[in-house]
Structures are given as structure tokens and as C-alpha cells.
């Protein structure tokens, strides 16, 4: 079968969203492709807040003669690329063309050494993609991302917090400012100025809240005895795939090692289950994070690896 490649157009946002839902179900609800919420989060955070666009330059579609989507190639972070394919239409020729497009169009200049580089992700054990990447001269992977999941069927654990802490949905106003501040502290612990900037202008978080799947009642926070936000976990419930994804999850440095992130996740998963979710997901890029999520019940996983090629 022949496919036609073209660049992203604004009308494709909803089409790609539906494509990811459909192929996720085709793949038995395993994250072979992205879930719908990751696409939304990248568009409304990566592109809107972190200058990872424009979409018209960072996303390519392959379509059948009937105009149906067969595959999507997109970045997440500059130069780091993901291949999303309809499993029934996947061929070596199509995947080869997608990798070639990434090499040609979706590279970046490394901030560390100033060299041109391109990265493509592959699930470990995917012999077809790994053979293509080797043929194109990609280095064997060093960095990996785990996609962890658990069943939400059956009884789920109640959130447990230290005395004086409470777990609930995030409020607005001052609490939103505090949530933005803690996000900066948690993800940039060596840069307090970043946390202050996060709180001074919350436009970035308002952008995330524009994502179609965002729900305030699933934006979970743990609140300390003094009323400050101590930890958070945002849950994305998809009523088509009946899944719940945790992203992001973090705890303020001064409140860590109290089980607060786990409590937020458990609260979010229970709420999502009440809405109909039957499977929960959370991604991790480090051993400590993976260990935390395993304790929270996410004991099943598949691993993705980032292959990098240095360009001339």
C-alpha cells in the first residue's frame, strides 16, 4: 500500500487525537503509540509553553489513498521524535521513511556540545525499528523511559498521609499560585528563581488547563498542615479508552519521603475508577521514580529507549 506524507495542518489536532485513541485500543491498551492525553499535554505544554513547535514543522502525517491516517511522526522536546503507527498498516518501508524524515527534518543542535543530533524512540525488543535505526547509524540507547501500569479493577488502596496533611482536588486562586511554585521547586530544585517565575505568571498552567481532557477534580494536591501545597499528581481520564494517566507527579523538596506523591496518585486513581477507568498509567525516567510507582501498585511495565544519531 502506498502512503502520502504531508505536514501538519490545524485541522489535524482532532484527527490525530482520534487516531491515537483508536490505535491504543488496537494495541490492546499498551502504550505502543502515545495515549491521547500525552498528545494534548505536548500541544498545550510542550508547544504552548516550552517553544517545542510550531506543530506545522514538528508533525508529519502519512495518509492512505482514502485520506485516513496511517502514521504520525512528532517531536517531544527538541530533536526527540516518536513514531505513531496504525498496527495494521505498519511496514518496513513506511517506518524507514518516517525515520528518514526525522533525520532530515526534526534534528536539533545540542546545547551541551553544539552538534547537530536527532533522537528516535523505540520499544525495547522491537526488532524492526531497531534494525532500521542501526542502518541509519543511530547509537545504541543509553536513556530509557519506563511506561508503568496497573489494573484499576478490584479494590484500590486508600490514600495515606502523615497527621495534618490532606489530599484533595486543587483549588484556584492562591492555591493555583502555590501549585505552580511547588512545580518549579520540585522540577528545578537548584533554581529557586524558576519557582518564583512559575508563580508570578501562571499563564503556562492556564494553557495546560485548556487541554480537552484536563479536569480540575482530577488535579490532585497534598496540602501540608500550614495550608501550603506539598505534592501533586495530575490525572488524565480518557472516557473512550477507560484509562487514567498520571502526569506530572512531584513533591516539594521539604515534604519529600512522606508518601505524599503516592497518596495523590491513589486518590486520583480512585476518582478515575469511579468515572469508569479500568487501567492506570504513569511514566518514569529514573530508578527512584520507578520504585515509587511500583510501591503505588504500578508493577507492570514496558520500556522505551532513545536512540541518538549525530549528524555531519
Give, region by region, the residue ranges found by the protein language model:
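Conserved active-site tyrosine of GNAT-family acetyltransferases
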Residues: 129-133, 292-294, 298
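Conserved hydrophobic beta-strand within the GNAT/NAT acetyltransferase core sheet
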Residues: 118-121, 246, 279-284
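Conserved N-terminal entry element of GNAT/NAT acetyltransferase domains
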Residues: 1-27, 139-140, 151-173
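Acyl-donor-binding surface of acyltransferase catalytic domains
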Residues: 75-165, 171, 305-309
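A structural microfeature
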Residues: 70-71, 142-144, 230-231, 261, ...
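Conserved acetyl-CoA-binding loop-helix of GNAT-fold acetyltransferases
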Residues: 91-107, 251-253, 257-274, 291, ...
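Flexible, substrate/cofactor-facing loop regions flanked by secondary structure
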Residues: 154-244
Amino acid at each position: 500500500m502506498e502512503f502520502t506524507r504531508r505536514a501538519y495542518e490545524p485541522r489535524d489536532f482532532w484527527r490525530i487525537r482520534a487516531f491515537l485513541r483508536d490505535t491504543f485500543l488496537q494495541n490492546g491498551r499498551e502504550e505502543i503509540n502515545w495515549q491521547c492525553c500525552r498528545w494534548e499535554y505536548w500541544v498545550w505544554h510542550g508547544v504552548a509553553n516550552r517553544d517545542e513547535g510550531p506543530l506545522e514543522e514538528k508533525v508529519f502525517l502519512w495518509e492512505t489513498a482514502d485520506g485516513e491516517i496511517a502514521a504520525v511522526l512528532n517531536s517531544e522536546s527538541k530533536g526527540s521524535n516518536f513514531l505513531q503507527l496504525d498496527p495494521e498498516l505498519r511496514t518496513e518501508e513506511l517506518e524507514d521513511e518516517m525515520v528518514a524524515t526525522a533525520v532530515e527534518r526534526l534534528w536539533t543542535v545540542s546545547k551541551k556540545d553544539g552538534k547537530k543530533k536527532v533522537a528516535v524512540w523505540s520499544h525495547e525488543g522491537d526488532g524492526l525499528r531497531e534494525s532500521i535505526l542501526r542502518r541509519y547509524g543511530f547509537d545504541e540507547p543509553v536513556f530509557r523511559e519506563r511506561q508503568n501500569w496497573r489494573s484499576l479493577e478490584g479494590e484500590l488502596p486508600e490514600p495515606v498521609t502523615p497527621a495534618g496533611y490532606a489530599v484533595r482536588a486543587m483549588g484556584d486562586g492562591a492555591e493555583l499560585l502555590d501549585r505552580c511554585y511547588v512545580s518549579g521547586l520540585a522540577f528545578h530544585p537548584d533554581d529557586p528563581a524558576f519557582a518564583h517565575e512559575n508563580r508570578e505568571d501562571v499563564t503556562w498552567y492556564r494553557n495546560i488547563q485548556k487541554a480537552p481532557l484536563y479536569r480540575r477534580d482530577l488535579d490532585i494536591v497534598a496540602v501540608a498542615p500550614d495550608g501550603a501545597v506539598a505534592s501533586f499528581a495530575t490525572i488524565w481520564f480518557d472516557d473512550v479508552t477507560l484509562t487514567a494517566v498520571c502526569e506530572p507527579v512531584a513533591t516539594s523538596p521539604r515534604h519529600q519521603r512522606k508518601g505524599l506523591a503516592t497518596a495523590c496518585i491513589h486518590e486520583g486513581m480512585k476518582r478515575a475508577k469511579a468515572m469508569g477507568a479500568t487501567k492506570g498509567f504513569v511514566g518514569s525516567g529514573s530508578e527512584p521514580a520507578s520504585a515509587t510507582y511500583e510501591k503505588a501498585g504500578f508493577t507492570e511495565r514496558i520500556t522505551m529507549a532513545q536512540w541518538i544519531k549525530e549528524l555531519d
